[in-house]
Regions:
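Structural detector for short beta-strands of small beta-barrel domains
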Residues: 1-9
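Walker A/P-loop
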Residues: 167, 172, 177
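Phosphate-binding glycine-rich loops and their immediate beta-loop-alpha structural context
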Residues: 86-135
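Helix-rich effector regions associated with P-loop NTPase G domains
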Residues: 11, 29, 35-52, 62-78, ...
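Short, Lys/Arg- and Gly-enriched loop/turn segments at beta-strand edges
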Residues: 51-61, 89-91
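Canonical P-loop GTPase G-domain recognition
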Residues: 117-169
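SH3/SH3-like beta-barrel fold
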Residues: 13-17, 25, 46
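Short, structured beta-strand/loop micro-motifs enriched in basic residues and often containing a Trp
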Residues: 21-30
């Protein structure tokens, strides 16, 4: 029987099987022997030991398509990144850092700008101009007014989505709306675990209940703590340009091969930024991250 690990705690792994619910499982010793640790999000083959009590063993961890470190989770299909249009105003450098992280992992990103009900039209237009031109899908929502929530639900269907964003942007309110009447906390897990005993924050998949009219193919959200800073240090500065998709049309047009689009003269990317074809906020954030990576190498 195949399922997905939705939570792991105290040596137990809770596996959601779409057709029959959540099973409390232990991992066989062979995984420890091979140095493999099951992760939340892993697709696994389980052996059911007790159907009534929903207990079993994990027999096999299926091949992972990707893996994140923070949060520790595997097999992410997409990321829903939530920022507010206003109150607080978006921290563009922080947003662009997260986009770079997802580009590096080849995880598609959907941008959700919340609190659009209290935002100026000029601010909404600015966000749209910056990020739609980079090729990212952009939604302007209001958790308070329920704007565009149904559209966001549709893009979550059948996917495992990491939900991320800084504190204070209405992420929790958005989750409450996305869950419709109930978002199962991994089925009966909340009854099996005494949460008071576990104060450490663990990665966890929230299982979205599907509309009865829609075939349930497994929709999950990975909620993450609000972040206030992100460091780009998992790659070299020469790779950074490949994580800004809007640079793509200008790669190869620079005078010098291997141009990093920072110091070199006759650079097509710099020229595009000067002409407004690449937004100055995005280009400036690229330069800031490039210099940060340059300093990392120096030390």
């Amino acid at each position: 029987m195949q399922g997905k690990i939705v939570k792991g705690i105290a040596g137990f792994y809770y596996v959601h099987v779409v057709e029959s619910g959540v099973y409390e499982c232990k991992a066989k010793g062979i995984f420890r022997k091979d140095g493999v640790k099951p992760l939340v999000g892993d697709n696994v083959e389980i052996e059911v030991l007790d159907e009534e009590e929903k207990k079993g063993n994990i027999r096999e961890i299926l091949t992972r398509k990707n893996e994140l470190i923070r949060p520790a989770v595997a097999n992410i299909d997409q990321a829903l990144v939530v920022f507010a249009v206003t109150k607080p105003k978006p921290h563009f450098n922080l947003l662009d850092r997260f986009l770079v992280m997802m580009e590096q992992k080849k995880i598609p990103v959907i941008l959700c700008f919340n609190k659009s009900d209290i935002a100026k039209e000029s601010d909404i237009s600015k966000m749209e101009e910056i990020y739609r031109s980079c090729g990212y899908p952009v939604f302007f929502t209001s958790a308070k007014e329920g704007w565009k929530i149904e559209e966001v639900k549709k893009i979550l269907h059948g996917k495992t989505t990491v939900l991320a964003g800084p504190s204070g942007v209405g992420k929790s309110s958005l989750i409450n709306l996305l869950q419709s009447e109930v978002m199962m906390e991994t089925g009966s897990i909340s009854r099996k675990i005494d949460r008071g005993k576990h104060t450490t924050r663990h990665s966890e998949l929230l299982v979205l209940e599907e509309d009865e009219k829609v075939e349930d193919c497994g929709s999950y959200i990975v909620d993450t703590p609000g972040f206030s800073s992100l460091y780009v240090n998992d790659f070299e500065k020469e790779q950074l340009k490949y994580y800004f998709p809007e640079f793509g049309p200008y790669e190869g047009l620079c005078r010098f091969s291997g141009c990093d689009h920072v110091h070199e003269p006759h650079c097509a990317v710099k020229q595009a930024a000067e002409e407004g074809k690449i937004h100055e906020i995005r280009y400036n954030d690229y330069v800031a991250m490039y210099r940060e990576l340059q300093e990392k190498r120096r030390y």
